[in-house]
């Protein structure tokens, strides 16, 4: 197919948009692939839509290859199914909610577990119908608080979501692994550099969960990897190795000290070293010897609130994402002055485990706060701390929580090396959901023995529209976009760089020849200057550019590789065959 630039609905820009923060956003707007309509909402123009459709085609082909069947469910969904699973509340402000003229509540679908479960329940009733995998490629909606980075994080986006239904856990694992392998083929075909990491399930529920993260310095997700073993996990999913229990018998009793003006960890450490505590330790006291107690308020889905104490080693900050993932579906809030006033035993800067437990405050600690570990921490009185407080003797936590930050050099949970932090963009997420949704809607079939069998689900998502931005993010250079052949809007971009009639006639011949070979050709037949055409060719990013200019009179054309920047002159008579050979390998 031939598309003439003189007829294409396209306007390129020379300057970056004022609101653009990352390269993909800047280039996709400048190159005329997308246009902003509202915060987090974008129009797809012809070139952008061609890339999007090609990504969809790759995803669709691989889903079909594992037996997936494509359907399309509505984006406008009733409230009731989401009330049944409690996600009407759990999703909080990220749901777009609306009501019809009769006052009935609806939402714009962020994901479709409920509807797929109900669809299978309505159609299947026998074990003979299973297993089945259904999928859709559809626009989703989430009311992001801070949409950013163009189509990387929008309020409206295209997603492939698929759902497997099996008779037992072995079947679920097989479906999960089939999707995992399909995702690897998809991302490999799209030319994306990615890593698979262990992840949390969040509001989706279920057990096993993995994310596919595209390597990118602009990614919002932090993950860690152990180069020695290959272990990788989203930072929210990292499990802190717990120390071996230490003996308690015969250990010195904890001692309360006057520690005036020491409300911070730094001031407490300074006091400890000046007061001779270092001699007791046989080394200088560090922040890692202190126990920091952070107070938060959890707001549960039923609206009830709970004050909780979080104990972490003093050399660690609380990671908001890890804390949030650990307490989902509850939301985390900071305590207000009114909360402290209502609970006078909470002495700012001097909070310790004792007062929390005496007053019925749930106290969760970092796994490093193991049995027999000794700490310097608050004594629940202004200007007082306790030294040598031993976990399991002087206080007993209500449980552990993964809330402390993960740092470079931390031991890997598999015990085979140390962790290194990196950033990535989530492009896929797969879940073994289990029975959360089939239990909620009683999705049963008759088993081989004539008794009901509850189906078990898996859920698998790919950010299809996000993939366009991810590819642009990973593949661009200082001149513009560089599309891999699998998703490029056109196979080849032909530029007429000479107003000579013979060159234009020759270009028409070359373009016709490429078209006859089944290639998609973008033909720059405009009367613009060669400089403008070359800049646009670099900005638009087709993998191959054919330049027909002064060399035509000498019987040559120039072939440019957009990825390598290499250019070669080839005989005009062989131009079509050479281009086809380069493209098809």
UniProtKB/Swiss-Prot annotation:
Residue runs in coiled coils: none
Cell compartments where the protein resides: Cytoplasm
UniProt cross-references to InterPro entries, sorted A to Z: aa-tRNA-synt_IIb, aa-tRNA-synth_II, aa-tRNA-synth_II/BPL/LPL, Anticodon-bd, Anticodon-bd_dom_sf, Pro-tRNA-ligase_IIa, Pro-tRNA-synth_IIa_bac-type, Pro-tRNA-Synthase_IIa_type1
Catalysed reactions, as listed in the record: tRNA(Pro) + L-proline + ATP = L-prolyl-tRNA(Pro) + AMP + diphosphate
Example GO BP: prolyl-tRNA aminoacylation
One MF annotation (Gene Ontology) recorded for this entry: proline-tRNA ligase activity
Keyword Aminoacyl-tRNA synthetase: yes
Pfam families: HGTP_anticodon, tRNA-synt_2b, tRNA_edit
EC annotation from Swiss-Prot or TrEMBL: 6.1.1.15
CDD domains linked: ProRS_anticodon_short (cd00861), ProRS_core_prok (cd00779)
Keyword entries, A-Z: Aminoacyl-tRNA synthetase, ATP-binding, Cytoplasm, Ligase, Nucleotide-binding, Protein biosynthesis
Signal peptide, first to last residue: none
A Gene Ontology term for the protein's cellular component: cytosol
Family classification: Belongs to the class-II aminoacyl-tRNA synthetase family. ProS type 1 subfamily.
Comment block on domains: Consists of three domains: the N-terminal catalytic domain, the editing domain and the C-terminal anticodon-binding domain.
Subunit annotation: Homodimer.
Role played: Catalyzes the attachment of proline to tRNA(Pro) in a two-step reaction: proline is first activated by ATP to form Pro-AMP and then transferred to the acceptor end of tRNA(Pro). As ProRS can inadvertently accommodate and process non-cognate amino acids such as alanine and cysteine, to avoid such errors it has two additional distinct editing activities against alanine. One activity is designated as 'pretransfer' editing and involves the tRNA(Pro)-independent hydrolysis of activated Ala-AMP.
Protein name (record): Proline--tRNA ligase
Source organism per UniProt: Nocardia farcinica (strain IFM 10152)
